[in-house]
């Protein structure tokens, strides 16, 4: 398993709250099922969202111009994580976002680093690099749109 190094060719990336760890499909070892294997149980406490205490943390708001807000909203409109948000929820997400300009060859996230932001690409080309066995290879590219670092939103 490995994280991705994201190295822009050029561009602008927008942060909102993350880290990017993606599993390399070649690393997955799927055991062959045996009829003699024991069944594994999973237990968890019941969760009732109505019983959850209200969030008392202060809301994070980064000031931005109307133009910046429109650009952020446009960059986020096709991101699956945000598709089912109502206008108020999306507004809160946009409030928490801030812009970050990225220079050519700057690493946005490095493999094995703790990520602390979720990134939304407004423009630019970003290479996704993975290092395995001391060899770095390109496994993908973002071109003028996309997002990465979803795991940071969970923590």
From Swiss-Prot:
Description of how the protein assembles with itself and partners: The inactive form of the enzyme is composed of two regulatory chains and two catalytic chains. Activation by cAMP produces two active catalytic monomers and a regulatory dimer that binds four cAMP molecules. Interacts with AKAP4 and CBFA2T3. Interacts with the phosphorylated form of PJA2. Interacts with MYRIP; this interaction may link PKA to components of the exocytosis machinery, thus facilitating exocytosis, including insulin release. Forms a complex composed of PRKAR2A, GSK3B and GSKIP through GSKIP interaction; facilitates PKA-induced phosphorylation and regulates GSK3B activity.
Chief subcellular location: cytoplasm
Annotated stretches, region: Dimerization and phosphorylation: 1-81
Species of provenance: Sus scrofa
Protein name in the entry: cAMP-dependent protein kinase type II-alpha regulatory subunit
Phosphoserine PTM sites in chain numbering: 20, 22, 41
Record gene name: PRKAR2A
Annotated positions binding 3',5'-cyclic AMP: 82-155
Keywords, comma-separated and alphabetical: cAMP, cAMP-binding, Cell membrane, Cytoplasm, Membrane, Nucleotide-binding, Phosphoprotein, Repeat
